[in-house]
Amino acid sequence: GSTQGIIDYNGMSISLTSGRNGPGEIWYDPTRPAVNQAATHVEGHAAAIMVENQIREMTITINNRNGPCGNCMRQLPERLPQGYVLNVRWLDNKGTIRMTQIVGRGR
């Protein structure tokens, strides 16, 4: 099924689902498959929310036991402004909470 994600920000919980429809569609480009994959994943939707609302740091917890995919890790730093940080948390196959950061280096 689709990856689900929950953002906790300012006492609000926002639920996201991977797919074409969502905040990440601002980056959707049919000619760039790697960008599209990142734009349609929950991490891409979260990154788009950060950009649209000028949120410099945010945490999303996802239900994918493998963590963020390679395309998200490669494509999203260019789409987040310099210094923005998206923390991605997940539970791995051993039940351990893991976390990685997607750090913005865009303009």
Short names for language-model regions:
Residues 1-107:
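Catalytic toxin/effector domains delivered as secreted proteins or via bacterial secretion systems
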